Amino acid sequence: MNRENFLKFAGMKLSFIPAVGIALLLGTSLCGCDDAVEFHNDPLGNFDALWSVIDRQYCYFDEKDLDWNAIREKYRPMIDSETTQSGLFDILSDMLDELKDGHVNLTAPFSTSYYRAWWSDYPSDFRWRTIQQDYLDFNYYSVSGISYAVFATETGRIGYMYYPSFSTVVGEGSLDYIMSALQDCNGLIIDIRDNGGGLLTNIDVLVGRLIDSEVSGGSIRHKTGPGHDDFSDPYPISYKPADKERVKWNGAPVVLLTNRGCYSAANDFAAVMKSLPNVTLIGARTGGGGGLPFSSELPNGWGIRFSASPITDTEGNPTEFGIDPDIEVHASDQELIEGKDAILNAAVKYLVSNFPD
């Protein structure tokens, strides 16, 4: 799939706009539906509008074995004409939490709902202060949102890159400087722990420095109708090497560090990296977030965002539930406070044992 067209999925938006009443217009390009469903701007009308757009456009009902009709019957009786704005927000937020999806948000003027259990119920496995203080002695460089340094071992050198957010644009020129500084290293650690995602274009930039030929990045589908299984055929996603004038990694082994805090674009990056032959994932399973978000608006003006276009990895597996590491390691909070990062230590040990001859 052409990358420009792929990125258009991320900008999808659907709005509830005034008509004779309040009309929900479901775009034909996304669901193949021409009908308009009217919802009134009252508590029950807003509930029905929200339930309906999720019913027609959300992409993970089957994977999560969700009975959306049963969920409607559970929450709709909680609402009547006397329901307050804050009460309605709480009920709608609780209903959306049934999706167990960190890409789902309900936004009102006074609050934004957010499903936190995808990361809050798991070990943190990371503390940046520990790395700064006990591993780098606060001696490192930072550019384009990436902090980088070199670890010296008895038998070689290991490059280290920490990228905390895909929301920060990675400049090609900045990445040239980083790759040049790490070029004589015998291995590379890319740390994306606690990276909650951001711009998909940064995946292209980073992966392009690690490959010599075009590689598959899995596939994406979009809704073609209101049914829960109405999807297009998969569109392939691919990644190309960086331009020849750019500085690329030297080909030595690479380790990607992950934890449950890796989500959305970081999760997609982990899926692509796991498919590369010279890359090993060490740490904990990522948080998931494998569906591109879709934006909409309720009759009362509240915004709703949710997963609408599912992404699968190179083997056809959904990435919504996270990417497993090749080597599972956890770093306890107590050890991190004491200055020990078991995940980083495991990565160094692995690379030292796999240094090129």
Which role fits each region the language model picked out?
Residues 1-31:
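Sec-dependent bacterial lipoprotein signal peptides
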Residues 6, 12-15, 131-143, 286:
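Short, solvent-exposed secondary-structure boundary motifs
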Residues 9, 14-19, 128, 147, ...:
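Low-complexity, intrinsically disordered short peptide segments enriched in small/polar/basic residues
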Residues 12, 22, 28, 103, ...:
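Intrinsically disordered, low-complexity regions
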Residues 13, 17, 22-23, 187-188, ...:
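Generic hydrophobic-segment detector
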Residues 27, 182-184, 248:
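Alpha-helix termination/capping residues and helix-transition junctions
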Residues 32-223, 227-238, 295, 303, ...:
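Flexible, low-complexity junctional segments that flank or bridge functional domains
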Residues 34-54, 86, 157, 196-357:
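C-terminal "post-core" interaction segments
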